[in-house]
């Protein structure tokens, strides 16, 4: 009887762990500067997409010169992902289609620091963060900062100055 009880306790303890779903993730990046770290990180993320639910890739200014090339670099990495996707799917069917990822590429704040935070300074990226948070999904949304956080700051500023501001933690 003790053995059966022990087995049942173990099953009850492990089932929630096995049932956990992927982590929701948005990445902010200053990709395209002189440091290749974000390109390397993005390639690594692409091969891990079976284990996370990517909800956005937001290019933004940090401290490097910002231009229109960031989205093209991101899309180049997604193109490379698309090339190897058939091989990745052989190992795990949960890899998302490249077009789904392309739709998540957004542009964030065009200037560094707090210069782009405040009234009328919303960006495609800050709006995307708000939209992702507002999804009907009980899982937490993780935001990985590979660059500055001013796009997230703008999203938080906007929500904190809206009718829902008192609910922002």
PLM region spans:
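Bacterial Sec-dependent N-terminal signal peptides
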Residues: 1-21
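N-terminal acidic, glycine/proline-rich low-complexity segments
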Residues: 20-169
């Amino acid at each position: 009887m003790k053995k059966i009880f022990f087995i049942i306790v173990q099953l009850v303890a492990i089932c929630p762990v096995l049932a956990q779903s992927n982590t929701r993730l948005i990445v902010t990046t200053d990709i395209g500067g002189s440091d290749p770290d974000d390109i390397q990180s993005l390639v690594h993320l692409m091969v891990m997409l079976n284990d996370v639910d990517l909800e956005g890739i937001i290019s933004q200014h940090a401290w490097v010169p910002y231009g229109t090339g960031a989205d093209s670099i991101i899309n180049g990495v997604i193109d490379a992902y698309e090339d190897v996707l058939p091989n990745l799917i052989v190992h795990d069917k949960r890899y998302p289609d490249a077009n789904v990822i392309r739709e998540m590429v957004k542009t964030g704040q065009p200037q560094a620091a707090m210069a782009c935070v405040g009234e009328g300074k919303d960006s495609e990226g800050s709006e995307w963060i708000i939209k992702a948070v507002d999804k009907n999904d009980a899982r937490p949304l993780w935001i990985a900062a590979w660059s500055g956080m001013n796009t997230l700051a703008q999203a938080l500023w906007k929500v904190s100055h809206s009718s829902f501001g008192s609910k922002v933690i």
